[in-house]
Amino acid sequence: MEKLTIQNNIRRLRFDHDEMTQQQLADKVGVTRQTIVAIEKGNYSPSLELAFRIALAFNVPLHEVFFVEERHS
């Protein structure tokens, strides 16, 4: 079975939305700035609810924020 790696466009989306800071996004979705940092770096996979909250904060579909990269092991 292939290992799935979740990638994201959060940093790009933040900059496309008036250079929103990590803290501003964190406040909008109800988490800490450190959580946003970890998600952006790929060190933390958000819950489904948080993933949708982030997409809603940018007013984009979920697949524009998060996507899966397949890696063959």
Spans of features found by a protein language model:
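Short alpha-helical DNA-recognition segment
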Residues: 19-38
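Alpha-helical residues within the helix-turn-helix
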Residues: 15-16, 27, 56
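Short, charged recognition helix plus adjacent turn
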Residues: 67-73
